[in-house]
Structures are given as structure tokens and as C-alpha cells.
């Protein structure tokens, strides 16, 4: 199978990561690498040698995005929605922005400040029922990077009724904020410092995390407190998730649930007891590392997960969903081992 692919927003970190992975995908060929502000400029990703001589084309739903089997939309919120509506049913989209993830219009408008454009099938294959929904899907909403790490850490316990009231602290590298120049991401500001941001439930990924947890509780609302931290590293997320155990739950039960849930998952590794996830171990891969522990003194479950925010957290997750939608083996073209040290 040969699949014609276009990448809208290929000049950014997420779009560039899609291109990197496509270069190693046996079924892919593409014509269009597009951008907004960098249209007409040479591809600015030095590590992508095979396309270094290419020039970014302007983004348009008519051309050059038209006529492709798959289009990856690696664009900021609201821009993807407008482009998808303009293209209509002719384009098969994998949206890597936030536009179509949330099911509640009011929640979307409160966190993003723009009109809600609906929701698409959610591209997290490991979540219950997702693979069936993604098979043959023409449009897929790729999860956010934080929700990917947190959902895969917590949904086995939440779905099994072992916990409630989630508390999440997650550390992310600077690439999660995009490639645009921002003063707080300058080397002098970031190096040697870890700082919180979007504290007090204001981060845009908070409702997505809650939505994913609620999806495995038969609609019973789940309370989530999420605090993100910016770390002086270019990529990676380490999420430390804590939740109150339901009475009578012990460490053995928790471990058994996670072992059963992830026994056959190609991209989720439940580590041996006593071994803890690290961002370096998953760097450049589509892999998720997970470890669980019970704090008996506090009656709390602690789950730690690590992902590469640009691979499994964005571009790799998008290709994984694309493989399922096209009927390809799910692991096609996706690295399963990290680069550490």
C-alpha cells in the first residue's frame, strides 16, 4: 500500500516529528509540506536530511492539501477546524491540534475561547473501544500530550473502580509549547529551573483528562486536579498521578489490573516492580512506560508514566491511529525503543 500524505504545519515541532516518522514508514509517500508563516522558506529541520531541499508550500484546503489520502493538521487551536471545514469530506484528516477532542461545547468555549466545532473519534488506541472506533475513520482527533500520559497512567484503575479524586503533577519539556519564540522559553529563562504554569485547573488539557476518565466510569464524573511543570529539557513528559483508593483495595489488586490491561499493548510497558519510568528511556519512541505503587499510610495509589511528548504524545500517536484507520498493522513505522542514554 502506498499512501499519499500531506502535513499542514510541517514547520513546527509536532509537524516536523510527523515528517521524521513518515520518512521511516514503509507505506508513505507525500507531496505537500505546508506552513503558514514559513511558506516559501526552506524546510527548517536540519535532522530531516531527505527533505532538506524542500520548500514549505502555503497551507490551503484546495491545494496543496487536496488530493491526498491523509492530511495531518499540526496547527494551533481553531486553525485546524477552519481548514477542515473548508476542505469538507474530500480530505481524510488526522488533527493534532485540540479542536475536535472535547465533547462538551461549553467546556471547549470556556478553555479555548472560540466556537465549538464538534468532536471526532478520539485517537488513543489503548483506551476501551478506541480501536473499533478508529478502524476506517476518516477524521481523528489526536489526544493532547498530557492527556495521553495521564490517561494511560490512570484509566485502568479508574475503570476498575479502584480509585477516585485524581491528583496529577506532570513535568514537560519545552517543545510542548511549540516552536514560536516566547520569552519564558529562552535558554536563560529555562535552564537550571523548573517552574509551574496554568495552576489551579486552568490548563487546557484538564477537561480532556477528566473527559477520558469519565469515559471509563459509565458517565460518572471524575474530579481531576492537574498541575503542569516546565522542565529544562527539550522533550518528554513525566506524569506522577495520585488517587485515593477505594476501601479494601490493596497493591496486589492494583498490580493485577494493570498487568491484565497492558499485557498485549505494543506501546505500553508496565515496568517490573521497583523500576520507575524516565523520560530518557522513551525519548524518540512511541513507547509509554508505566509503574504503579500503593501508599498504604495515605490510602492512595501512585502511578508514574513517561512519554516523549512529540512522539507518543503527538506525532507517533497520530501515525498509530492512521495505521488503524487504513487497516495497516498498528505498529507500522513506529519506533518502540528509546534513545537513552
UniProtKB/Swiss-Prot annotation:
Gene3D superfamilies: Dihydrodipicolinate Reductase, domain 2, NAD(P)-binding Rossmann-like Domain
Encoding gene per record: argC
One annotated GO molecular function: NADP+ binding
SUPFAM superfamilies (UniProt xref): Glyceraldehyde-3-phosphate dehydrogenase-like, C-terminal domain, NAD(P)-binding Rossmann-fold domains
Pathway listed: Amino-acid biosynthesis; L-arginine biosynthesis; N(2)-acetyl-L-ornithine from L-glutamate: step 3/4
Localisation per UniProt entry: Cytoplasm
Family that this chain belongs to: Belongs to the NAGSA dehydrogenase family. Type 1 subfamily.
EC identifiers of the protein: 1.2.1.38
Chain's role: Catalyzes the NADPH-dependent reduction of N-acetyl-5-glutamyl phosphate to yield N-acetyl-L-glutamate 5-semialdehyde.
Catalysed reaction, written as an equation: N-acetyl-L-glutamate 5-semialdehyde + phosphate + NADP(+) = N-acetyl-L-glutamyl 5-phosphate + NADPH + H(+)
Listed GO biological process terms: L-arginine biosynthetic process
Record's keyword annotation contains Thylakoid: no
Signal peptide limits: none
Xref: Pfam families: Semialdhyde_dh (PF01118), Semialdhyde_dhC_1 (PF22698)
Keywords per UniProt: Amino-acid biosynthesis, Arginine biosynthesis, Cytoplasm, NADP, Oxidoreductase
Residues the record marks as active site: 145
Protein name, entry field: N-acetyl-gamma-glutamyl-phosphate reductase
Organism (species): Streptomyces clavuligerus
GO cellular component, one term: cytoplasm
Lineage top rank: taxon: Bacteria
Entry-linked PROSITE patterns: ARGC
